[in-house]
């Protein structure tokens, strides 16, 4: 923990509502004139989109499953290093995962690729992380020990799946069938690596549906 360079981490799975909490913090920071270093958890994915597909197939050949929910598809060591360095000096290295064609075009890259690693601005007041592993523990890696405030977006899985299906099909170019397969492939890592983090957070928030979410895949036409 660091009084001089505090870290806030918002942790939750795809579709959990973490982006809404992030926006709330952005409004607070703007009003209070707080300069934040915004970190996306996807920056620490180990593979770009094309290579990830290859690695998923390779894992299946070995009777294994690989997903971004688990540690093997991510640089958790680099994320821990960032948190350690920022808490100590207010600096560190990060990058971006370019999810959509629109964002990728701004970088002159293809969607699903990663930008080069870059040093954070040295004049920030705090670091705000939003991603899958803000409270993760894996072997000797203990990311949960660094944030001064850990917020968990706890599961409401049917609502999460509905939001993920809508986002990935409308913004990221996936078919509904592909998103459904992705959800199924991630289930083991969801149980073993995502949900345990919510016992380490300081505050947990759960989104409540105001519409029928009984069958997230009921409108699947493929």
Where are these regions (language model features)?
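NTP-dependent small-molecule kinase module
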Residues: 1-2, 121-123, 188-222
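Short hydrophobic/aromatic beta-strand immediately N-terminal to the Walker A/P-loop
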Residues: 8-11
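The conserved Walker
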Residues: 14
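Conserved lysine of the Walker
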Residues: 18
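Post-Walker A alpha-helix
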Residues: 21-22
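Post-Walker A helix-loop "phosphate-sensing" segment adjacent to the P-loop in P-loop NTPases
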Residues: 27-37
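Conserved nucleotide-sensing/catalytic segment adjacent to the nucleotide-binding pocket
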Residues: 37-40, 44-103
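ATP-dependent NMP and nucleoside kinases share a basic, alpha-helical "lid"
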Residues: 111-170
